[in-house]
Amino acid sequence: MSDRNTSNSLTLKERMLSAGAGSVLTSLILTPMDVVRIRLQQQQMIPDCSCDGAAEVPNAVSSGSKMKTFTNVGGQNLNNAKIFWESACFQELHCKNSSLKFNGTLEAFTKIASVEGITSLWRGISLTLLMAIPANMVYFSGYEYIRDVSPIASTYPTLNPLFCGAIARVFAATSIAPLELVKTKLQSIPRSSKSTKTWMMVKDLLNETRQEMKMVGPSRALFKGLEITLWRDVPFSAIYWSSYELCKERLWLDSTRFASKDANWVHFINSFASGCISGMIAAICTHPFDVGKTRWQISMMNNSDPKGGNRSRNMFKFLETIWRTEGLAALYTGLAARVIKIRPSCAIMISSYEISKKVFGNKLHQ
């Protein structure tokens, strides 16, 4: 039985269970690369520590407290691009910037583990699991459902996966946007020692979120960065699914050597390799939006300008500013960590999904 026929014969519940099969595994294995990627991407926003003589301004996180402002190496004032954790960082970490600056993916991985504790690499894992399971269920099952009922499925078979993948990602990304925002913020917070408790960070983060909701409203605060997230995720999905469908048809193992390309283990290898290749291509193409998303979500609005008037609301101008002030390489910060995460993540997720579908399909026809 062909893959498409198997997919058509499965119920929506079975597709969703298939999609959830690999979510736990990928989250447990690959969350550390998410933490490393976010830490690398926020580095240009971290001021060089100069506590002595630094000016104090009201802190948006807690009423009545003070936070210090700094000037970066180039002399540009950072008031309009503060990281939300600045006050907590410079109060509790005592400006130990040695634990904040990294020269690459491997150094970031080892420094975070040694300074903050190995468990810091899995910070936010509960949120990751809480998001990954429903998001992947919506995403994968939604993609196949839309693909199968699409009016252009027969007339434009090459374009159909592209459009269906993009539509499925819009629903999936929007459904988990508030949780993704909280997870990104939580994973970005550094600490100077292993004694700093995660619950303290969560408490400060929730307090900061409440303050921002009062400033700009619940919807703008909780869905902050959704637009640029969609600019990252929708093209990613379009590229991924079109590449995956192409790779799956072209890369299957020689059926003359093996009994059938429908054999479970051959099917697994084909799906794994296709997912790995497609994920890497999509990650490279969309990475500048990932950098922009991280910076946008961890930045804190100026108290005197709740509408964010001093920051461009256009994400393309936002990315262009990063390019002009820091160079093109800044838009690819953390690419290695993201590719290291996405390649096996896509491979494990799609192969688990395909194999689970085959299991359900086999039971259906027994």
Curated annotation (Swiss-Prot):
Bilayer topology: Multi-pass membrane protein
Keyword Cytoplasm: no
Transmembrane segments: 17-36, 126-146, 162-182, 229-249, 268-286, 331-352
UniProt cross-references to InterPro entries, sorted A to Z: Mitochondrial_sb/sol_carrier, Mt_carrier_dom_sf, Mtm1-like
GO cellular component: mitochondrial inner membrane; mitochondrion
PROSITE patterns cross-referenced by the UniProt entry: SOLCAR
Knockout mutant characteristics: Loss of mitochondrial manganese superoxide dismutase SOD2 activity due to misincorporation of iron into SOD2 rather than manganese. Normal SOD2 activity when in association with YFH1 deletion. Doesn't impair activity of a cytosolic version of manganese SOD. The iron regulatory transcription factor AFT1 is constitutively active. Accumulates mtDNA mutations. Elevated mitochondrial iron and manganese levels.
Further information: Present with 538 molecules/cell in log phase SD medium.
Family, similarity comment: Belongs to the mitochondrial carrier (TC 2.A.29) family.
Functional summary from the UniProt entry: Involved in the mitochondrial activation of SOD2 by specifically facilitating insertion of the essential manganese cofactor. Has the ability to activate iron regulon in an iron-dependent manner. Responds to calorie restriction (CR) strength.
UniProt name for this protein: Mitochondrial carrier protein MTM1
